[in-house]
Amino acid sequence: MASTTVAQLAGELNRSAAALLEQLQAAGVQKATPEDVITESDKTRLLDYLKRAHGSAEDGARKKITLTKRETSEIRQADATGKTRTVQVEVRKKRVLMKRDEAGAAPAEAEAPAPVTAPVVDVEEVARREEEQRRQAELLARQEAELKARQEAMEREEAERRARQEAAEAEQRRQAELAAKKAEEEAAAARAAAEASDEAPRRKAEEDAARLASEREAAQKAAEEARAAADKIKAEEDGARKRREAAEAEARAIREMMNAPARVLKTPAERKAEEKKAEQSGTLHKPVKAAGEARPAPAAKKAAAPAAAPAATPAGDKKGGRGGKPGGWQDDARGNKRGGLKTRGDTGGGVDGWRGSKGGRNRHGDDNRNAFQAPTEPVVREVHVPETISVAELAHKMAVKAAEVIKQMMKLGQMVTINQVLDQETAMIVVEEMGHQAVAAKLDDPEALLVEGVQEQQNVEAEARPPVVTVMGHVDHGKTSLLDYIRRAKVAAGEAGGITQHIGAYHVETPRGVITFLDTPGHEAFTAMRARGAKATDIVILVVAADDGVMPQTKEAIAHAKAAGVPIVVAINKIDKPEANPDRVKQELVSESVIPEEYGGDSPFVPVSAKTGQGIENLLENVLLQAEVLELKAPINAAAKGLVVEAQLDKGKGPIATVLVQSGTLKRGDVVLAGTAYGRVRAMLDENGKPAKEAGPSIPVEIQGLSEVPGAGEEVIVLPDERKAREIALFRQGKFRDVKLARQQAAKLETMLEQMSEGEVKTLPLIIKADVQGSQEALVHALNKLSTGEVRVQVVHGAVGGISESDVNLATASKAVIIGFNTRADAGARKLAEHQGIDIRYYNIIYDAVDEVKAAMSGMLSPEKKEETTGLVEVRQVFHVPKVGAVAGCMVLDGVVKRSSLVRVLRENVVIFSGELESLKRFKDDVKEVKQGFECGLSIKNFNDVKEGDQLEIYEITEVARTL
């Protein structure tokens, strides 16, 4: 027969060889490695061990049989309406027959040969009973051990107490003996001294006597203290004796409990049957009697208030009804003869009575006798109000109900709900009105983490950086052309309409250093762009055309530069033109507080020509000179910080932001945060579109990889990890949304009555999509300025990127016109717009977009009605015609009278009636018009009080189209 190894047996059993080796060791089979051979005897020993460990095969034999019996019957039952219906009743009975142990059954048969029916008990019930008996045995063993330990502790305590008592008694006896001996010695010495010297002064004798008396008192006091100590020891002995007796009583109770017969456990079915029987044996009117004697009344069981229970009514007293039964219901203690409310026990109106005291269910009577009384003075709380807060949260902070806050808001003229969000200003007004102190609170702002990075950058050594120069000026004054000459590029030639509509960032390397230029638009709509350019700049080049002079946007650029506190270098452009007048430009700039250096000011004036290049070198030299004076420095080896100059959405690349690095070094792979946008820099391009690995201070770059298009002008910060950037971005989004909603709600509530009083204002809904963020902002701003009291521009949605199907769907829902500025709609959007009839307009010059929207708004204006006098008629004679009324015979003094004209009746140059002509005749013929110098007959509708000498003024009302 082939031999079997440990590893082979383990494979057959689907177990690991290590586990099988452990089981073999436990079974007493010594095997060390998986290659050892196992014999049949080893397998038998292992099998016996496993049977002993997990139960033998005999345990698996069938020991019980379950019999299930099902009976179906019908009963007739009346329902709530009184109708009788048949109900099917199914009774299921389950019996479990257990196989008895043969070894234990033989003696039972010998003792009791008669067949005895064993109770049928479920196996689970048997197991539960055994478990309960085991727990009781463990509890008794534990209690006996605790009792034994307590007895030993008490015996030790008793021995220690006896030792202490004996020591105290010995000490007491010794002290008493010493005191008595000392007193006798001193008394003997005193007597000897008195006998030896009779001449000693009496005073000394008295002192000795007093001293002896004090010593005697001290001895007496010591004896009393000894007695007190003995009494204390005796009291401790009594306490120990009482504790010992209590422990013995407890032990005796435990022994009695152990010797008592075990309580027979009953199955759940038996317990339910007994409970049902007990419920049926007694009712509310028929109390239960057991073994011929009545059950005691529930009121008698309460020992807490025995005096409250009324006296039992005698059995023969008929006034008490069934008073012969102690557990029965009794009449009221006052003895209501007419059979009033039957009560049981105490009917007093006390706190503990089941009736309760006088005052109904809301009584508080004596319960609040010692309750805390709230202070009557108002509590003034310091309420910290965040930027946005709901009405419920504000009420919670003031510890008042939300209804009180809503009432206060209604008094202030605002209808709010409990979940409505209030802005900080409104909430602080409400808090002050309700008598509390409002404090503007700072939120748990995760942006506080950014302060640490700023402090770290301050510790880094700063190095010199290139200047950032912004070119500003009026439209068509040659800003971009000037930059083109400096950069040796031709940007202006490719711009739509010959005007700049984007903010551009470039850096130029000159022999004296690097200069970064920001080119801003000059059109009035691009105010926000110019403000951003002034914010990020160090020096402003103000370009003024020598033939045009100072214009509105020139003044605005001066204001931006002064607000930013940056120096101005004036470039007087187009000096090559014959009509150039630089002196007039200087005088106009002096009136705007821009003083040239030659007049004692601090602004250098440089005449230049972007066409010929005249003065360009002098301009750059002045710019670099100003930069040296400013001593521009920034840390280089630090996390980058910058400004979003422009942002756009590319269909393939996603959000793209033009960032001007202000400090530190921006590298590819950095995690950046810009407003509510965040992300890792996936790609970085310079202004020429070439990839760049890093960008230092004052260098503009385009970055890709942001989560969304950031707002132009947002600050860009490099953070250590993306998780923190996401947390801050989400916090800013929620904060921006809450503040925006709160302000919109406040604006709606404030303007609701105004809108109702003004009537319906016509609106022109628009959806604006632009190529870059700045253009979109400028277009929205320019179009909103066109709104009037009658026609209003409503920008439903403004965003960056191409026109998509979602934009067309939004336009369909809001009935809006889509404007695409330097962007186009995709194929799906064009098809959907054609199907829905949505108008999509494309523009690449901001003038054209503004002019067309202005024309559309003019068409929406209601036409103006204009009155024009066409003739004057004098009444010469009046004829009264039956069924027609008064007919006036008239002479046309001036103009023409038409059949469809309106008429005013003038009597002594006072208008007495205005109406229209009913008929116009010349002789007997109806005519359409009568010219000057001819007579005619006419009648006026609904007016017969025409007199000779009246004058009739003939006029017409024409509608004239209005324009904005």
Curated annotation (Swiss-Prot):
Residues 346-359 have a biased composition (Gly residues). The keyword Heme does not apply. It holds the Pfam family IF2_N. InterPro entries: DNA-bd_dom_put_sf, EF-G-like_DII, IF2_assoc_dom_bac, IF2_II, IF2_N, P-loop_NTPase, Small_GTP-bd, T_Tr_GTP-bd_dom. SUPFAM superfamilies: Initiation factor IF2/eIF5b, domain 3 (SSF52156), P-loop containing nucleoside triphosphate hydrolases (SSF52540), Putative DNA-binding domain (SSF46955), Translation proteins (SSF50447). One of the essential components for the initiation of protein synthesis. Protects formylmethionyl-tRNA from spontaneous hydrolysis and promotes its binding to the 30S ribosomal subunits. Also involved in the hydrolysis of GTP during the formation of the 70S ribosomal complex. This is Translation initiation factor IF-2. It comes from Ralstonia nicotianae (strain ATCC BAA-1114 / GMI1000).
